Amino acid sequence: MIHFSRSLTRLLGELKKLPGVGDKTALRLAFHLLKSPDNLTALAESLLEVKAGVRFCSVCFGITEDDPCHLCSTERDRTTICVVEEPQDILAMERSRAFKGRYHVLHGALSPLNGITPGDLKIAELMKRLESGAIREVLIATNFTVEGEATALYLTRLIKPLSIRVTRLAHGIPLGSDLEFIDAATVQRAVEGRSEL
């Protein structure tokens, strides 16, 4: 077994916490960074900058440096809210250029088997936004997974009694896929072909 210095071992451990990074990738990344101290310094500084400056928007719960975020403070359709699971899903929707409304990030999906309940998500905050009476449509853009579908159904049951139109992305997106990995054209077709729930 190879023994590394304490600091390198710690770096490897931290890198392996990233999604999709195992032992080999962590080692490759660590040695790449060590070859170029300037890159290592720049990475460390950018991580500290993100930690200090990036937060969640108090309106949509997307990622921002300004509060409210750019999408919440610009002139977009204020009558439509697109509900997504994670902040990166906003990027997928924006790449399509098909959606012109506002967003709401749940920060997950319902998953009773994993202990994720409505109280763990930003559902209460969504319902509070809907109380204003200005919202005419909620587009549910949760992932097409069991958890995403369960979340969409749960939200539909909460929102329908408010006489707000509830729509879902069209099912042109493959079942079991995550929205953040879908190409812009497919997302655009899905937004244009959304259907009432």
From Swiss-Prot:
CDD domains: TOPRIM_recR. It comes from Geotalea daltonii (strain DSM 22248 / JCM 15807 / FRC-32) (Geobacter daltonii). Gene3D superfamilies: 3.30.60.80, 3.40.1360.10, 6.10.250.240, RecR Domain 1 (1.10.8.420). Belongs to the RecR family. This is Recombination protein RecR. A zinc finger (C4-type) spans 57-72. PROSITE patterns: TOPRIM. Keywords: DNA damage, DNA recombination, DNA repair, Metal-binding, Zinc, Zinc-finger. Residues 79-174 form the Toprim domain. GO terms for biological process: DNA recombination; DNA repair. May play a role in DNA repair. It seems to be involved in an RecBC-independent recombinational process of DNA repair. It may act with RecF and RecO. Pfam families: RecR_C, RecR_HhH, RecR_ZnF, Toprim_4. The keyword Cell membrane does not apply.
